[in-house]
Structures are given as structure tokens and as C-alpha cells.
């Protein structure tokens, strides 16, 4: 039985390369990322939260939901191909609901 996977996305910010993109290039990047997310079967589990006011490391965070681990892997491979990591600095943590986690 496959388990839903959740990914906490901690966004540090954008690289200088991102700020060099034109508005059309930025739109194209986010369109590609959106298609990757849709194709992978992922969805936003929460809105995006502004957290810059509360720390000096992250500007925002959100949570993604995947039907299974393979979907999460497809999403990561797809955004890599779309070159998102060239433009955004982030950290992610994958997990499952505690009720679904393996016993220790």
C-alpha cells in the first residue's frame, strides 16, 4: 500500500541569476514548474507562508502532498530539468503522517 508523502519546502530566496531573468522568462520558468507539479501528481497541501519576519534564514515555506514516493521523485527530477535549482535556494524535508510512520 502506498503512503502519501509530504514535503516541507523551506525557501531561502532567489539567486542572482533569477533576478537577471526578464518577466517573460520568469513566467516561463514558473509555468514549467507548474506543469511538472501537475504531471507528478503533486498538489499544494498548504498556502505559502511568509516567515522572513521571524528568522534570518528563510523567506517563506509551504507543504506539498504526493500520492506516493515515486511522485515526489518525479517532481524533484522535473524541477531539476526545469532548472529551478539554478534560480531558487531551498531546503526540503520529506515525511509521512505519524499514524502512517513505521514503528520504531
Question: Language-model segments: which ranges?
Answer:
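Short amphipathic alpha-helices in soluble, non-transmembrane regions
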Residues: 74-82
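Short S/T/G/P-rich N-terminal loop/turn motif that feeds into the first structured element of a domain
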Residues: 1-58, 66-74, 95-104
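Conserved, mostly hydrophobic/aromatic
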Residues: 62
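Conserved short beta-strand edge segments in small beta-sheet-based binding/regulatory domains
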Residues: 84-96
